[in-house]
């Protein structure tokens, strides 16, 4: 046994020596004393605050024990009551390569599959996922803010929770108070290198000091159930326009301009905020009163040159009657003079600047759900009884930044300015503008010609220019049957035409026999016996279609009519001759004359006419110098502009459905859109975010343009009319979803319906596309039910939301598919629907509006 012990002892000594030899030289192990030994100095430590005890505990412990805590047993480690005061301040020694390699690697996790990720992302997008509670609360908070601004007053309970700062959850309505929130570190940009510091603060442990900044919530005030901080009005100076209006009003009334513009500057200037006290303000104790307001000495009026305008709460403080006094937690009224007095006056260093910085750091104007700009105009409000679950959802809402609104407004303004500078401005007004001028016509004489143009009351370019830029115009989107028939009739007439040569050798032009003078001109038309042969090798087959002025298969070298490429006996199928024979005299009457007229595309329906260049330019047409026949040009391709058609006979510019959303008919039209976007669109985007609003804006605009292309095919329309009514539909959906929250929901519904009805009646006037308004509103209504945030009022409401999302998306897909089929496959013609966009109040009220779905 002794030998065994001896051997065992020797083995243990050898192993310990080996371990000591392997111990890294930079490893130091220090075992701290037990916790009760460190807290033994006396009972006076127990009377100190918890943070102060932790600071003393931290100073009494060695500073090297936290460097290598892995070597200490867990039983010897002290229990951390407050981890914020037990952070190590010692520097770690550089670790060797052996220590770095010995660290444990994190474990591997199985990555979610693509289908699971897509399914989870879709559920979070529509707000039906299981872990979407926090996001849903944020949506609900934002929706309450929007409702309070747009749809009137809320219920009383919901309004009180809405006035809470974002750090306080509305669910804390009982006797328990939440834990104090940690105030973020705020850096004063005006401190010029001086840190915020208490005057008596030394480099020693101390208890947290009460805040010296007046008018701002302290750390302990965040534990209160009700705080008056959210009642502070926003600091806002008068704009230049406001001061100009006041100055103009003062001049009209005979007053001094300085008195009118300086009314707000008569108060005593201060760079700090007065203490705010409200009737419903309830705090936890008297310490908050002592640490949140000025002493009597600091309430005196002292001039300040830091800020030029009066502070935020100064004007708000003056509006409170002197009879109003705050109430302590015990229910005892505190006099006003004692309420604004601090027990211990301290130095003023850093107080006033800190109040400004903290106010702007915590102050964020939020958008209430269901209440927004329109709700503020219509004085809507929440009802008084709202459950705590709904209140928690409303409290957690934050406002998005309206990136899409600013981008869209910038694009609209820039494009409108570029269009005006490039294409100019058409005649302004509501009637027809007639221009008369003497123009050289086909017969070689000057004639009086009228050009009728529709005036544009939007102060912008003409309809032809808007079509060329990308306006909604059905003949450019798909093949139109009536325009195709019109082109076929013109080609039939051209097939029987001939060359009219003037006898005085003044020129020639392609025309009909009835339009050529029998005495002053010679009409050249091939007959069965006078026409040239089809091919030089077969002289028996003669041509009967022709002749064409300045074009003949016998003289054209490129493309040549020979072999397998013989030109057909139909002049409407002849190609453009790019190279003629180099000979001054061919011996053919229709070839040796000077041609006076060539094809000209006039109007917006693809109509072609062989005429002079002067007449074509006067009629704002497109003159084709290279062609001799109308069948050789494609007028619709030239009128539509943008990208050329893949097949010249088949229009395919379907991208006009969304391209026209960024165009405007004029400056006034653009200003109306900018005002709408900076009020309604901006307010909705703060609620739902740019991605959701962008989807609703674009899809509802495309749907409205698609319907307008079906029912008003020959009317060029630009602007986001369908998108704007889709956003108005979002207001209705938001009203329906926040119906249980509003105090008077029916009044809000009637007010909003009156606005939409008024806009619909305005759409009965000319030049306003009511078809796009109607279908944009329907599509926006369906999309808003699927994409807008939704406040749930229970488990059944959550399942109802899922069903509503599915039904809304299916209904929108069905509506969009039906419109596509009606546009491309089964065109419909409902003449009565024209009255929805221009009602004929008189016999000539909608004249020249180009509403007819039948071309003449």
Swiss-Prot record:
Gene: RHBDF2
UniProt keyword annotations, A-Z: Cell membrane, Disease variant, Endoplasmic reticulum, Growth factor binding, Membrane, Palmoplantar keratoderma, Phosphoprotein, Protein transport, Transmembrane, Transmembrane helix, Transport
Top-level taxon: Eukaryota
Keyword presence, Cell membrane: yes
Location of Phosphoserine modifications: 90, 113, 117, 323, 325, 328
Chain segments annotated as transmembrane: 410-430, 661-681, 693-713, 716-736, 748-768, 774-794, 803-823
Biased composition (Basic and acidic residues): 94-106
Source organism of this protein record: Homo sapiens (Human)
Record protein name field: Inactive rhomboid protein 2
Family: Belongs to the peptidase S54 family.
Tissue: Found in the epidermis and esophageal epithelium.
């Amino acid at each position: 046994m002794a030998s065994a012990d001896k051997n065992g002892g020797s083995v243990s000594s050898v192993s310990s020596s080996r371990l000591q030899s392997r111990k890294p030289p930079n490893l130091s192990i220090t075992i701290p004393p037990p916790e009760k030994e460190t807290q033994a100095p006396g009972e006076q430590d127990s009377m100190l605050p918890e943070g102060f005890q932790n600071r003393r505990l931290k100073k009494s412990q060695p500073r090297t024990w936290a460097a290598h805590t892995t070597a200490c047993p867990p039983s010897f480690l002290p229990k951390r009551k407050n981890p914020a005061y037990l952070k190590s301040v010692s520097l770690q020694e550089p670790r060797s390569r052996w220590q770095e390699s010995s660290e444990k690697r994190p474990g591997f996790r199985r990555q979610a599959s693509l289908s699971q990720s897509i399914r989870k992302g879709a559920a979070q997008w529509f707000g039906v996922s299981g872990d979407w509670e926090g996001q849903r609360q944020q949506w609900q908070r934002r929706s309450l803010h929007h409702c309070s601004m747009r749809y009137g007053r809320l219920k009383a309970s919901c309004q009180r929770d809405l006035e809470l700062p974002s750090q306080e959850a509305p669910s804390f309505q009982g006797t328990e108070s939440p834990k104090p929130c940690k105030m973020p570190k705020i850096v004063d940009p005006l401190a010029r290198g001086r840190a915020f510091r208490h005057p008596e603060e030394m480099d020693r442990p101390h208890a947290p000091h009460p805040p010296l900044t007046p008018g701002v919530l302290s750390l302990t005030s965040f534990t209160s159930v009700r705080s008056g901080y959210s009642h502070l009005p926003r600091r806002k100076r008068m704009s230049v326009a406001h001061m100009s209006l006041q100055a103009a009003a003062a001049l009209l009334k005979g007053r001094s301009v300085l008195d009118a513009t300086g009314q707000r500057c008569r108060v005593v200037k201060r760079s700090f905020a007065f203490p705010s006290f409200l009737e419903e303000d309830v705090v936890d104790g008297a310490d908050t009163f002592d640490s949140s307001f000025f002493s009597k000495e600091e309430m005196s009026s002292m001039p300040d040159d830091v800020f030029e305008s009066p502070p935020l709460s100064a004007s708000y403080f003056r509006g409170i009657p002197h009879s109003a006094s705050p109430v302590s937690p015990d229910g005892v009224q505190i006099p006003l003079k004692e309420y604004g007095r601090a027990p211990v006056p301290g130095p003023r260093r850093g107080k006033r600047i800190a109040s400004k910085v903290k106010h702007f750091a915590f102050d964020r104007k939020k958008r209430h759900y269901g209440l927004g700009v329109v709700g503020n105009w219509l004085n809507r409000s929440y009802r008084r009884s709202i459950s705590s679950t709904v209140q928690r959802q409303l409290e957690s809402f934050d406002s998005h930044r309206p990136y899409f609104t600013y981008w869209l407004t910038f694009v609209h303004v820039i494009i409108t300015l570029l269009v005006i500078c490039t294409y100019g401005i058409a005649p302004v007004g509501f009637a027809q503008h007639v221009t008369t001028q003497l123009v050289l016509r086909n017969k070689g004489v000057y004639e009086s010609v009228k050009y009728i143009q529709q005036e544009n009351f939007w102060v912008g370019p003409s309809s032809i220019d808007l079509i060329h830029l990308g306006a909604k115009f059905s003949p450019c989107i798909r093949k139109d049957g009536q325009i195709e028939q019109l082109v076929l009739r013109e080609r039939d007439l051209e097939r029987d035409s001939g060359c009219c040569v003037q006898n005085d050798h003044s020129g020639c032009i392609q025309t009909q026999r009835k339009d050529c003078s029998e005495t002053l001109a010679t009409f050249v038309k091939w007959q069965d016996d006078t026409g040239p042969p089809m091919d030089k090798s077969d002289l028996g087959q003669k041509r009967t279609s022709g002749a064409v002025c300045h074009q003949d298969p016998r003289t054209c070298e490129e493309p040549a009519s020979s072999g397998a490429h013989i030109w057909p006996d139909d002049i409407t199928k002849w190609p453009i001759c790019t190279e003629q024979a180099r000979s001054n005299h061919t011996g053919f009457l229709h070839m040796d004359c000077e041609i006076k007229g060539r094809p000209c595309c006039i109007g917006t329906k693809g109509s072609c006419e062989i005429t002079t260049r002067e007449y074509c330019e006067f009629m704002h047409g497109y003159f084709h110098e290279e062609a001799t026949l109308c069948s050789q040009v494609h007028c619709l391709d030239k009128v539509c502009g943008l990208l050329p058609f893949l097949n010249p006979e088949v229009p395919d510019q379907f991208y006009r459905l969304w391209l026209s959303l960024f165009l405007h008919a004029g400056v006034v039209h653009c200003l109306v859109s900018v005002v709408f976007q900076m009020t309604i669109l901006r307010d909705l985007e703060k609620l739902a975010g740019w991605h959701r609003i962008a989807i609703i804006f674009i899809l509802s605009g495309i749907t409205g343009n698609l319907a307008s292309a079906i029912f008003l095919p020959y009317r060029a329309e630009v602007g986001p009319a369908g998108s704007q009514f889709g956003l108005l539909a979002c207001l209705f959906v938001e009203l329906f979803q926040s119906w249980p929250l509003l105090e008077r929901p029916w009044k809000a519904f009637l007010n909003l319906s009156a606005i939409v009805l008024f806009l619909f009646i305005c759409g009965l006037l000319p030049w306003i596309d009511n078809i796009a308004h109607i279908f944009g509103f329907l599509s926006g209504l369906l999309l808003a039910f699927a994409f807008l945030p939704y406040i749930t009022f229970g488990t059944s409401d959550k399942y109802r939301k899922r069903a509503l999302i599915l039904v809304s998306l299916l209904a929108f897909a069905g509506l969009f598919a039906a419109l596509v089929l009606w546009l491309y496959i089964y065109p419909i013609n409902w003449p009565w629907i024209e009255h929805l966009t221009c009602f004929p109040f008189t016999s000539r009220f909608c004249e020249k509006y180009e509403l007819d779905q039948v071309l003449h």
